[in-house]
Structure formats: structure tokens, C-alpha cells
Amino acid sequence: MVREVLERLMRGENLNFSEALATMNELMEGKYTEAQVAAFLVALKMKGETEEEISAFALALREKARRVITQTEGLVDTCGTGGDGRQTFNISTAAAFVVAGAGIPVAKHGNRSVSSRSGSADVLEALGVNIDLDAKGTARCVDEIGIGFLFAPNLHPAMRHVAKTRREIGVRTVFNILGPLANPANIVGQVLGVFTPELQETLAKVLNNLGVERAFVVHGHGGLDEVSLTGPTRVFELNRGKIDSYLFDPLSYGFSYCSLRDLQGGDAFENARLLQEILDGKPGPLRDVVLLNAAFGIMAGGVNDFREALVMARESIDKGLAAEKLEKLRRLSHEIKEAG
């Protein structure tokens, strides 16, 4: 099957859902050699991935994952594809705590850095959170405190079959897209930032195929895989099967534009300091961009009005609720690890 799939991709032919599902299952079971994995990823990238292929690949990853089974319903994730090359501060990670502080349960799926100096796992580790939990421990965090961090390597063991090849070929592949789609908790809402606007409509459709009810697929001004504060953001909104697109402008909600430099961070420890300062109430562009992204996360959790969601995001920070979520996650993640 490997040779047939490669030949078809190199001819520019698309795989149907069942073919794509079978192919990803074989990849995740280690049935491809490293050379075949590389050939598959490059051929697929050159052809261009379809909605059907991405949906099947994501479903295969979810089925191979260690499921995070929670008692909590209405879970939301805030994440990006990475790969925008803009070296921004960990905006979606900070926003996750603000969303949780507003009462929306968060299952934050993430990993170490892909394209920046600090991925979500890196900054949380620098903040003192124990990221090395199994599925059961992560579910306990979500159920007890309303937020948990789903560390991808612990929950997607089958990814080891492609990890080395991904690193060595050194270019963006379908796996950069699949990471945010493969959350092993039963999320119903998502804010998904993408590195190119060409992916937005496709990924909104994929999220619908995967059973997500409310999602915002965003590509911000300046090429950000976040809701931007440097200019407007193109949004594709999924709401129970219906997809709309529009331009979101922060100026309409009383914010001022900033420069890209204002949103950039440093290494994991610098970003940890910045994140803690935001949750502790420090004003400025970083707080503002986190508020915007958190408001979309709150809407993904079921709030319909953006202004109302923005009020909830501000209160989450100003009343110390977001900072409290971080402190509780820090404490509980270590308690769980020590208990074994």
C-alpha cells in the first residue's frame, strides 16, 4: 500500500477518507520506513492536503491517543499551529488561564517549541507546572480545578514513529496542522490560530467533521497564528455546523494597535515572567492581546456576545481568578506526580 499511496500523491491525486485513515494508521503503527515517512510527508505537502485527508488523519491520531476522560463537559482548547515565525509571547497559553478563570473549563493541548523559542509546554514548565502527567492525572486537573495541560508526547505515543523524520526534514508538514486537531479530550469548543489564511476555511470544516460545536479559526494581521493587536484578524467561525467568515478589528472594541515587537517574547523563562505579570494585572499590549484571544475562547465555551466575553476576560484577570487557576494547576500537578 505504501508504494501505491506515494505514487498517487506524486501524481497529484487526493486520497479519500478511508484511504487517508488507513494510511495514517499504518504510519502510526510504524509500518513505514523513515525514508517512506519523509517521502509521504513531502509528497502530501507538494500536492496540498484536502479537508477529507486532514479529517481522516486527525481522527486516526485521536483514536491512537491515550484518551483524557473527564467528568467535565463543555471543554475548550486554545492553541495555534505554530510556524508563523513571529516569535510572539505565549498568547494562547496565557489566554487559557483567563478562559478558565472566567468559568469555562479548558483542556489545553500542547507541546514544546516548534518554531519559537518557547512552546506552551516550555513556558508552563518554567512557571513551575508539572507537565509530565498521564491521561488520568490530566483529567483530574480538568475536573478539580477547571484547567489541565495535555502534554502531547505523553498522550500520543504513536507519534514516535514520525518524530525523527519530522525533525530531520525541517519543513512544515501536515503534522503542524494536525497537532491542534488531535486533542485527546472531548473538546466541544476551540480557538485555533493558523499560520496561513489559506488553511482557515478547510480547518473550520475539519473541526466540524471532528464534532467540535463552536470554533474560531483565526489568522491575525502580521501573519500571526493568534487574534492580533497589530491590525485586523480574519476569522472563520464554526457554530453548530454553520461556518461564517469576517474581519475582526480590535479598534471597534476600544483597543489600540501596537507593533509586532510589543507582542514578542523571549525564552521560556522570560515568557513565564511576562505571563505571570499579565495574570497579576500588568497593563499593556500583552494584556490586551491576551484579553482578545481569551474573549474568543470564552465564546467558544458558549457565550454568544463578544463584549460580554470581553468583560468576563477582564474580570478573570482583575479579580485574580486567572492567576488562581495557574497557582492551583501548579500545586495540583505536583501533588498528582508525587502521589504516583
Swiss-Prot record:
The keyword Magnesium applies. One of its GO terms (molecular function) is anthranilate phosphoribosyltransferase activity. Its EC number is 2.4.2.18. It is an enzyme of class 2 (transferase). Anthranilate 1 binds at G80, N111. Belongs to the anthranilate phosphoribosyltransferase family. This is Anthranilate phosphoribosyltransferase. It comes from Carboxydothermus hydrogenoformans (strain ATCC BAA-161 / DSM 6008 / Z-2901).
